[in-house]
């Protein structure tokens, strides 16, 4: 199919004509700014980013409080759960499934959280596979407040100190979102449409 024929079909579907003016992209001014290393300041910046990304955040004093918050959510929504957690987190009550593709909620432990972007960082390991963070329609991440960092560069520094990049590093920044050829944003097509983060104070 010729390019113009294809574009004309797209225009017809959108109710547009060929000579419609193209919007000029906005110009953004990017300024480097110093970050505080104070944990409370990093947490507040991270919370601000999560609010912009439509991510629900729960502040938990302890690991057990975070687990109870998850259990309450599962009971309220009647969700089946699949997870990529190590043995430290065993004991969460709920309706479990071994198949992440059949679960309503996936649960993972994030190695770090990046305040600047609102991202959580997962590192692939034997007990941390990608399925639980990709396949269910909703996903939750446990992250310790002590693992909040300012920028991506801080994560790379820690990885380098640990011997370099592992097999897989995944960064999750809000719900999965994609856009089609005309920029229409769709949430949840290629991953979870709901994201929850549980920040644990004393971990």
Predicted features, each with a name:
Residues 1-203:
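The feature marks the mature, well-folded catalytic cores of soluble enzymes
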């Amino acid at each position: 199919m010729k390019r113009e024929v294809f574009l004309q079909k797209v225009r017809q579907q959108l109710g547009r004509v060929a000579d419609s003016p193209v919007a000029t992209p906005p110009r953004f001014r990017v300024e480097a700014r110093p970050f505080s290393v104070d944990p409370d300041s990093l947490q507040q910046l991270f919370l601000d980013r999560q609010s912009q990304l439509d991510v629900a955040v729960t502040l938990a004093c302890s690991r057990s409080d975070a687990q109870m918050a998850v259990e309450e959510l599962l009971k309220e929504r009647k969700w089946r759960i699949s997870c990529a957690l190590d043995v430290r987190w065993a004991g969460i009550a709920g309706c479990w499934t071994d198949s992440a593709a059949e679960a309503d909620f996936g649960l993972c432990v994030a190695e770090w959280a990046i305040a600047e972007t609102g991202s959580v960082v997962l590192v692939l390991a034997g007990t941390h596979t990608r399925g639980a963070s990709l396949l269910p329609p909703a996903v939750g991440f446990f992250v310790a407040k002590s693992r909040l960092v300012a920028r991506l560069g801080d994560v790379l520094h820690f990885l380098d100190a640990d011997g370099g990049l592992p097999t897989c590093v995944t960064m999750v920044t809000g719900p999965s979102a994609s856009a089609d050829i005309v920029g229409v944003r769709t949430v949840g097509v290629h991953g979870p449409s709901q994201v929850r983060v549980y920040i644990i104070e004393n971990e």
